[in-house]
Amino acid sequence: MICAMRSALCFALTCLASWIQLAAAETCDLLIRGGRVVDGTGSPAYFTDVAVKDGRILALGKLNIPAAATIDAQGLIVAPGFIDVHTHAENIEDLPLAENFLRMGVTTLVLGNCGGSALNVAEFFKKLEAAGISPNVATLIGHNTVRTHVMGGSFMRPPTDEELAKMRSLVEQAMKDGALGLSTGLIYLPGAFAKTEEIIALATAVAAADGIYVSHMRDEGAEIFEALDEVFRIAREAGLRAHVSHIKLSGKASWGRATEVIAAIEKARADGLDVTQDQYTYTASSTGISQLIPETAREGSREEFLAQLADPDKKAKIIGEMKDKLKRGKREDFAYAVIADYDKDTSLNGKNVVEAAKLKRGSDSIDDQIEMILEIQRNGGATGVFFGIDEEDLQRFMQHPNTMFASDSGIRKFQEGIPHPRGYGNNARVLARYVRELKLLRVEEAVRRMTSLPAVTFRLKERGQLREGSRADIVIFDPARIQDRSTFSDPHHYAAGFKAVLVNGVVVVKDDQHTGARPGVIVRRQ
């Protein structure tokens, strides 16, 4: 009798709990109706409704519940918000709407790449939370930032034991404060002078917190295999996941070797390493014009650089090294390098070095091209766009299942300079050119590379998939109309084709226009 009463009571309580749950689910903040859901896993798309409540996905299915707002998604794709794992969006403090990212569907940005980041991660996060931001933000801790803080201008050497201990302590604190891992920029100063052993020592601190090592490698051209081996060694000896930033083969001398690069990565994975990579979908890169100048000439202060140029012998050595590098890359001149943002003389923005030399020096000889480069650096430097990537290599990297899509961009100031178009169009370009036009990828696979793959790799929990209970970062786009509109010659155009972009359940983009909302949160390592 007692057992029967207990069973009846349990049944009644179960029914009551189910009724309460059903009642709570009878209303939602937003109902997305009739869309073709691409859930981020790579599974085939299917048609269903999506209900959003309190910043999370409440339910998926054929839903008939009251909603405060409704979006008709018939004929449109509904997918998780895109995650960009390689940005330089530290300027989000000044540009919190991050419009170029949101308007191409990116809802979560990973900052701190290429070795450069905020030093005090906790303080940086605190500022962003106080200001309010449109996208979600996570960060890595940058090796160059840490090395500069500890070693100052004396960086052409290994750190002392005491300095290395200080660097490690800073990395450990950043990880405690929520950084996702450690990034390096090994073509930049001061990281270019760091030995592999130094990076391993710092990476072990990251491994202890289940972080990731993310590297702009020492070389992406003739010595790319040696650079990859260094990444693999760091991952192996430190015992952590590794990620190769903006994978590419730079310069004609290296073109056609993408299959070999992929084979090297696959061998490392077969040997037990967890290695992934990202790419931007353009045949040009972008960094400082200073990268055309030898490291040894850039290693000191601006005054020291100017002193080298004033010394005839030292200047002749710099010029000779620049000519040698040009020949090694099988290039005849510097026409591949375009000035993107030069504050000293904006009339040169959009012109390549050959054109700039002809315009300003009256000659486009190699010597005058080099003088033009040195003059730009003498006047404070400029960012540049460098054409040197083969489309066939790009597509081979794209077809690898562990290649993510990342912009390598900061937040754009609209109509300022002639920047690389990737900052406005990278994700939309994947879906327009490589999915719709070239059919190189299925839409389900392309979306997986932008969502669940980066979420799992970088440990961004509750994001990257459309499923009940996950954060409601959602993009709704027209697969027939989605388009990158930014070009190298005319870059300041936002992507098109987005019906809506939601961040934590709040509509941030509506019909290709930013709403001004700032619902973004800090995504800390968990």
Label each PLM-derived region with a short phrase.
Residues 37-49, 354, 381-394, 438-447, ...:
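Acidic, glycine-enriched loop/beta-strand segments at the rims
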Residues 35, 50, 55, 75, ...:
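Divalent metal-coordination and catalytic microenvironments
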Residues 25-31, 37-81:
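Histidine-rich, glycine-flanked metal-binding segment
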Residues 35, 311, 395-402, 407-408, ...:
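C-terminal cap of metal-dependent C-N hydrolases
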Residues 26, 73-78, 82, 87-89, ...:
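Divalent-metal coordination cores built from histidine and acidic residues
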Residues 173-231:
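Divalent metal-binding pocket/active-site signature
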Residues 140-141, 145, 149-161, 165-189, ...:
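Active-site neighborhoods of metal-dependent hydrolases
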Residues 8-21:
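Bacterial N-terminal signal peptides
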